[in-house]
Structures are given as C-alpha cells and as structure tokens.
Amino acid sequence: MPWIQIKLNATNENAEQIGDMLMEETGALSVTFLDAQDTPVFEPLPGETRLWGDTDILALYDAEADTNFIIDQIKASNMLAENFAYKVEQLEDKDWEREWMENFHPMKFGERLWICPSWREVPEPDAVNVMLDPGLAFGTGTHPTTALCLEWLESMDLSGKTVIDFGCGSGILAIAAIKLGAEKVIGIDIDPQALLASKDNAERNGVADKLEVYLPQNQPEGLIADVVVANILAGPLRELAPIIKGLVKPNGALAMSGVLDTQAEDVASYYRDELHIDPIVEQSEWCRISGRKQG
C-alpha cells in the first residue's frame, strides 16, 4: 500500500523531542533524522547522541492517516514556530527490500580483491572474493576508509603472516587478509556485537578457523603481528597510539584510516617516533596513514 511522509525542519536541541512526540501523539510508524545542511558529524562523545544544527525530520504514516490531525497535534505541542513549514508527500508502494538489494554491487579493490554481496554473481571466480552482505552498523567496503584499507591489504604480501584488525567491525578487513594469504588474523573491537559479526562473516566465507576475536581487555598478553590495520577514528588513533604501535612487530607494517585530510598530519605525528611513515593517501577527503616499524 502507499504511505504518507511528512517532512519538518528542527534544530538539534528539539529534534529528538519532536521525533518522540510524532511517534507517541500522532501515530507515526517511523521517524528519521536527516542532515538539512549536508554537514557531517564525527566522533560523538560516549553516550552522546549527536544531531546536526539544522535537522530534517521525516515521519512515515499509513495512507489513511489524517494529515490535518497530525499537523494540528504538531502545532499544539508548541515545539516549532507558529508558522512552521512542512511538506506532505505520498510515497508509492515498492518492494523496498529488492530496491535496497539492487543498490549494492560487487566492488573491486586493487588487482584481485572483490567484495561481493551474497545475492550477486561473483564477477571473477578465480579472484580473491569476500562475500559480505551490507549491514546496519559495520563496514562493507562502500566507505572510502574501508576501501583505502582494503587496497592497502591487497597490495601487501600477506602469505604466512599474522595480521591484527584493530577495530574489526564486520570483519571485512580481517576476512580479506585471510583470503589474501594471511596465516592467522586477530580481530579486536570494543563492541561484542562486532566480534559476533566478524565471526559470523568469517564462517560464511569459510575462514573462521583462521580468525580469533577479542575484546581489548581479553586479548592475549604480548600480542604482536607482522601487519596491523586500524580503521577507526582520529581521536582513538591519537589516544591509543602507544597501544597500536606496540602491536606491530619490528619491521612490521601498519595502516590506519578513519582520518580526514585535515587530521592526517597530526595523527601521523603520533607514530613517527617508531615508524617510517609512507606518503599519506587521500580518497574523498579521507586518508590512509601507513608505515613500517623500525627494526
């Protein structure tokens, strides 16, 4: 059946309250917050829900909803200016799951590595193929930071090497490393759900026997690896620099991403005391910092 969507604009101070009101008082089936100014929000504080200064609110209703009643309820809430602007749209019914699936295609990284959704045919059966379905929380290769790390791993000789994926998320980098020849990969993440996702995706790719996953507090003492990759954010890369450097063997390699071009030189400065840093690689304002630890 078709749906009705009502679009409002709010500030970050009252957007969540308005969203709650739409759900509780007007019968909205779902409420979505969008950035009205295309301004990214990075690195919220622990426990903080960050929204944009200018936020669009999209509320979805079934086709029979009384839009006059909904607008009257919004006015009565006094959460918006008296003459607030709004837009009512009718959305056609679609096979949303199929449309969502059609947006994802196999992606190639470097010369031989493919990330492919399970419902798509593998373009090159003889290439290195990682089967990974898009999820809500963790990387699938579409973000520049993940792509930068995948390209770096693909360029390395990982045969027989031990690799640490620091902040493993979906396990995409860990699984790619195994498929590219790594003997053993250790995934570390602060989120237990990430560890479950990594193990599940490794099972689907037939490489679970080569992947170990740990919360930071449970990782083995003295853990080090030939290759370390950390796709997290600039703040943690700075704060955890001593820990991350300590995971890299002498003459071992490290790659980091999740860093904007304006942050890259500063983040790199935290690692130059122990690593020879390669030229920084940029893609769509995001950067990869890589280097080799001094022997």
UniProtKB/Swiss-Prot annotation:
Signal peptide: none
Membership in a protein family: Belongs to the methyltransferase superfamily. PrmA family.
Residue ranges crossing the lipid bilayer per the database entry: none
SUPFAM superfamilies, per the entry: S-adenosyl-L-methionine-dependent methyltransferases
Residues holding S-adenosyl-L-methionine: 146, 167, 189, 231
Protein localization: Cytoplasm
Gene Ontology biological process terms in this record: methylation
Keyword Cytoplasm attached: yes
Gene Ontology molecular-function annotations: protein-lysine N-methyltransferase activity
Enzyme superclass (EC): transferase
Protein name: Ribosomal protein L11 methyltransferase
Gene3D superfamilies referenced in this protein's UniProt entry, alphabetically: Vaccinia Virus protein VP39
CDD domains noted in UniProt: AdoMet_MTases
Pfam families per the UniProt record, alphabetical: PrmA
Physiological role: Methylates ribosomal protein L11.
Classification via InterPro entries: Ribosomal_L11_MeTrfase_PrmA, Ribosomal_PrmA_MeTrfase, SAM-dependent_MTases_sf
Domain of life: Bacteria
Keyword set includes S-adenosyl-L-methionine: yes
Organism: Vibrio parahaemolyticus serotype O3:K6 (strain RIMD 2210633)
Keywords, sorted A to Z: Cytoplasm, Methyltransferase, S-adenosyl-L-methionine, Transferase
Catalytic activity: L-lysyl-[protein] + 3 S-adenosyl-L-methionine = N(6),N(6),N(6)-trimethyl-L-lysyl-[protein] + 3 S-adenosyl-L-homocysteine + 3 H(+)
Annotated Gene Ontology cellular component terms: cytosol
EC numbers for this chain: 2.1.1.-
